[in-house]
Amino acid sequence: MTKNDITRGLIDFAVSQCLKNIKEDPYRSIRRLADLGRQFAKGRFQEELFSLFQRLLLNEDGPYYETLKQLVSSVDTDSLKTLGINIGYNSWTCGASRLRQITAEKDYPHWLAEISLSPESSASQLKEQLSAALKNGTYAFRLHMPAQSITTDTRQLGLIREFPDCSFFLDFMDTDCTYSDDLLELTCSCDNLAFLVPFGSLQSRQLVDLLNARQRIYGVCRTYDNTNAAERISDSQISEMLSWGSPLLFFLAAADTTQDNRLLVDNAILDARLHQTYPALLIHL
């Protein structure tokens, strides 16, 4: 057993206790989670991030307490704990340390790797990609579903269980949001998996309803371009996204979006976080 294994075990126990007590004493339990992150942070990025969390949580009247309480009450506890530790410790701490070590050796890889689940790719090819990224310190993966998502090879998605220390984000953004019963049951049984669902269509909303019923973690995502960047971050459109039931809201720029419009959205999201404008965590992909 390695030092990291022991540390993860301690974190697992502490997080379990916090999640157990969060309904009775949300303020203390949620602050304890932020304190844990700061305590085990190894790099400057992690220390600054969890220090920011601690400062934001000083405002007991802010919306983030309700946001986290909603997550705990609506999402399966094992999934919430697994994804939280895999991202906060494995990706942002252990993985980040490895990524810093190899910076001088090759181009700096991102902590979140993007992989397309094309029908032409085999499960063995995907396993090789995941294993190679893991060696470099990447523990989080955004898996892009094919346009007709129902055609996804379940053998590929079955690999998620073979990498329990990793986090996976199943991206439906470029799909028709169709699915088979086998696909849904397989993905909903993986505690280290979250879903990215596009806002807007009836098929998307039906998928969200099924994920809610199964207490799965998902984020609602909206794309923007040069014609609607300001509109996408307006109070009215963010309220529309919140009506779908997830406090995790993602914003994705179209490929030809200018840097000025990307910065517009980026700054608006940062401002909303710091001023705790919404009962949600806004994330710019």
Model-derived regions, located:
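Radical SAM enzyme [4Fe-4S]-AdoMet core and its adjacent flexible, acidic
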Residues: 1-39, 191-285
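Generic detector of solvent-exposed, compositionally biased contiguous segments
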Residues: 1-8, 14-27, 35-75, 162
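N-terminal [4Fe-4S]-dependent radical SAM core
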Residues: 41-116, 139
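Core AdoMet radical
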Residues: 111-124, 133-151, 160-179, 184-203, ...
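Compact recognition or signaling/catalytic modules
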Residues: 158-159, 165-175, 242-243, 265-269, ...
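A generic secondary-structure signal
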Residues: 102, 128-136, 158-159, 185-186, ...
